[in-house]
Amino acid sequence: MSYIQVLQLISFAFLMSGGQVLFKKTALSISAGLNNENSLGLIEGILKAATIPWLYMALFTYGIATLFWLYILQRIPLTLAYPFSALAMIIVPILAIFLFGEKLNWSYWIGIIFIFIGITIIAR
């Protein structure tokens, strides 16, 4: 696999991760000011989500990522390309720490190391 192809796959993982962060921002906007006792039902939550710009940015990001994925799959076998999507399982939690103040336990960090090792082996 060429360096350009690896860069494309990493870029795809970052696009998907960005979409996930935007979906989280949407979810936080939906639940802003609510507690568990007066949380919105499914229909009310969907209707409120439709008014939140973060949702449209998330969907746009996923749309671009999907088109980019199709471009990638024209050039790289799925068996080589797909494991790189696991990079999102590394990127998203790290972003969640910095953007949302979420915490990761030690077992998650060990899992991240194994994911990174696996992707490195596949990329060779």
Predicted regions and their residues:
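Polytopic alpha-helical membrane proteins, predominantly small-molecule transporters/carriers
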Residues: 1-124
